[in-house]
């Protein structure tokens, strides 16, 4: 039987962790769409990796209270790979697709990247906040669908220079590029003791020569995804899939 899964952040848990109050949106979906009632069984995940089997205790007009029966294993286990995927801002629904598929593929964090050739510009902090809120909602819906108990965290849009400088000894930085790149195996061998991976994918226009030079300067590894020209959203999905296959839980 398919689990009826709902999201509740830790703030929604009572101090003793025995009861959970669902948000208005989650409660409305349970009550009005799924037609659930008192004593029905549901599952709740907290976005941090924990999942609980619960029973509906009370139904209000704008909320729903659940009694926690037990902590249970998540519907799907998390990948052992701590993967940050940074993708140049893309037009329209392309970035929405990246958010959805990155969540399904077990990406830990998603960074909207501001690059020279990015398809979209951020007008002001309010515009950035609206976009991040939208993308985080997409990540939440995708997590519900694919069975993850941990949410992919969508960061605020970040300048490429800032991300390039953020690399440390425990990070393996991989810049996927259509030119001047090597193999993913060579990238792994360049820093055998890495703990996490930060992978970057550019826009349709690719990276500028200056961006490639800066990446090398900060010891990022340049990697190609084969000889075919991929759309940016396809490249992002392929990059995440490749890294999860080699280092995570795919295959």
PLM regions: where:
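Short, acidic/turn-prone active-site loops that include or flank metal/cofactor-
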Residues: 72, 204-205, 227-230
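Structured adenosyl-cofactor binding patch, chiefly the S-adenosyl-L-methionine
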Residues: 209-251
């Amino acid at each position: 039987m398919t689990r009826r899964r709902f999201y509740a952040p830790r703030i929604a848990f009572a101090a003793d962790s025995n009861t959970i109050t669902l948000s208005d949106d989650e409660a409305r979906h349970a009550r009005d769409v799924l037609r659930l009632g008192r004593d029905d069984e549901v599952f709740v995940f907290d976005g941090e990796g924990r999942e609980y089997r619960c029973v509906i205790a009370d139904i209000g007009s704008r909320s729903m209270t659940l009694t926690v029966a037990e902590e249970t294993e998540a519907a799907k286990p998390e990948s052992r790979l701590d993967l940050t995927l940074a993708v140049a801002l893309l037009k329209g629904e392309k970035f929405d697709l990246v958010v959805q598929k990155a969540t399904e593929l077990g990406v830990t964090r998603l960074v909207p990247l501001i690059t020279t050739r990015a398809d979209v510009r951020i007008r002001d902090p309010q515009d950035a906040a609206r976009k991040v809120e939208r993308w985080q909602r997409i990540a939440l819906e995708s997590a519900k669908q694919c069975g993850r108990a941990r949410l992919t965290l969508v960061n605020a849009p970040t300048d490429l220079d800032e991300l390039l400088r953020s690399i440390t000894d425990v990070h393996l930085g991989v810049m996927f590029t259509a030119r001047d790149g090597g193999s993913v195996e060579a990238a792994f061998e360049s820093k055998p003791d890495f703990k996490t991976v930060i992978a970057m994918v550019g826009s349709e226009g690719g990276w500028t020569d200056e961006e490639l030079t800066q990446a090398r300067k900060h010891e990022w590894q340049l990697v190609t995804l084969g000889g075919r020209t991929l759309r940016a959203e396809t490249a992002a999905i392929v990059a995440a899939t490749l890294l999860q296959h080699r280092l995570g839980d795919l295959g």
